[in-house]
């Protein structure tokens, strides 16, 4: 995720996410550098890439190498979720990506987690080196 730091400079940080109905959800601790930055500059840019595969036309020709890939760039504004039930719903979405186990959350943990909600305002996609059947 790309954000603007307190001095107006670009700042990028990897974060776990979940996506549902045009909204990207992220989570973090309740305070810290990222939270301060987003409170001042709520506009963010989030990018995802998948399917990286090195391909080439000629093994000994460096310029013939490229990377097959798909990517998405999303822009939006961060809103912090405060509702406890909504926080649990988002935490469940995040956890279901990593485990089939049913997860429980301690009340203090839910209260202290910062849930980031980004409604996607703009989205662009790109693929490189993929056949239509691979998209």
Where are these regions (language model features)?
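Helix-adjacent hinge/juxtasegments
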Residues: 33-56, 63-65
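A broad, low-specificity signal for short, low-complexity segments enriched in glycine/proline
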Residues: 4-10, 34-42, 75-82
